[in-house]
Amino acid sequence: MRAVMGININATARSLLLSEFVSAFFLAMRYFFQPKPTLNYPFEKGPISPRFRGEHALRRYPNGEERCIACKLCEAVCPAQAITIEAGPRRNDGTRRTVRYDIDMVKCIYCGLCQEACPVDAIVEGPNFEFATETREELFYDKAKLLANGDRWEREIAKAIELDAPYR
């Protein structure tokens, strides 16, 4: 670093020649002519992790019977108290099924504890993140809506559970 009469010559030369400006300009031009890394969201969708927590769904067994055994573990573990379950009477074989299974999606914090607590993988958070509504009442999911979501997203949900299996 050379200084003449208290003036740093290197810093003065850089500021007079605008070297930072020129290097920034060339850097910007290099990125200007490359393909853009951003996505055109509504038309292009990015990759979703197998652990993504989106819209809730109730799954069925391959024979069509619903998986939920009305153990109410998901209701007990929900920190937001967004899940309400009513169990039906015991059947002849000793099993139970739900009569009512409601999730208030406005209360839900999408923590995934309900999915972790479920012993039969009945309640899952699926890959759907586009479920905006016009009214709050539409975000109150009943059993029929949850089962419809499960039927709609079963292929993607099963694939995500399979990919996540080594980490469970």
Curated annotation (Swiss-Prot):
4Fe-4S ferredoxin-type domain segment(s): 58-88, 99-128
Record GO biological process: aerobic respiration
Compartment list: Cell inner membrane
Iron keyword on record: yes
Amino-acid positions noted as binding [4Fe-4S] cluster 1 in the UniProt annotation, renumbered to this chain: 68, 71, 74, 118
Record's keyword annotation contains Metal-binding: yes
Keywords for the protein's UniProt record, in alphabetical order: 4Fe-4S, Cell inner membrane, Cell membrane, Iron, Iron-sulfur, Membrane, Metal-binding, NAD, Quinone, Repeat, Translocase, Ubiquinone
Catalyses which reaction(s): a quinone + NADH + 5 H(+)(in) = a quinol + NAD(+) + 4 H(+)(out)
Protein EC: 7.1.1.-
Membrane topology: Peripheral membrane protein
GO molecular function, one term: 4 iron, 4 sulfur cluster binding
Cofactor(s) needed: [4Fe-4S] cluster
Signal sequence residues: none
Gene3D superfamilies tied to this protein: 3.30.70.3270
GO cellular component, one term: plasma membrane
Major location (coarse): membrane
Disulfide bonds: none
PROSITE patterns: 4FE4S_FER_1, 4FE4S_FER_2
Residues that coordinate or bind [4Fe-4S] cluster 2: 78, 108, 111, 114
Quaternary structure (record): NDH-1 is composed of 14 different subunits. Subunits NuoA, H, J, K, L, M, N constitute the membrane sector of the complex.
Family affiliation: Belongs to the complex I 23 kDa subunit family.
HAMAP family listed in its UniProt record: NDH1_NuoI
Protein's job: NDH-1 shuttles electrons from NADH, via FMN and iron-sulfur (Fe-S) centers, to quinones in the respiratory chain. The immediate electron acceptor for the enzyme in this species is believed to be ubiquinone. Couples the redox reaction to proton translocation (for every two electrons transferred, four hydrogen ions are translocated across the cytoplasmic membrane), and thus conserves the redox energy in a proton gradient.
Protein known as: NADH-quinone oxidoreductase subunit I
